[in-house]
Amino acid sequence: MPDVEVVTYLHPSWSSLVDDINREPEGTHILVIGYSLGANNSVLVANATNYIDSIIALQPSIFTSNTALTGKVGRFVEIYNPNPWMTFGGMGSQKLIGPNIEYVTNNDTHLGAPFNPEFRNLVKSEIARLSAEPGPEAAPSVPPPPFPSPR
């Protein structure tokens, strides 16, 4: 997929991600994928930006705060394992709080979750979906002239 930029951040650097998102031109499509504590912090990112097209939160952890989503997100999918014993006592068992979150449960161990083909296919389909939508370069840089008034 052309013109797709991928940047990786460690979970404690979520505020740097916010800064980078806020520097993007209006209309740039943003997909945030967070795993474990990064999944939890995807909510903090959404709450500190104007808009995110899509978030995929993979197995958020119960070992940190569970901040409610208040930011604007077009689509938010959370994949988690409700059985804490399969995720090292809850590292992938947190159910995030917020409107319009699509919850998907799985039986993956915490370390095995990123290798799940359903997760990987979801990531690919979201990238393809957002890549197919017009970006900021599709918007005219100068507004069109007004129509002449009828006489």
For each of these PLM feature ranges, what is it?
Residues M1-T8, N50-S54, L96-I101:
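Structural alpha-beta junctions
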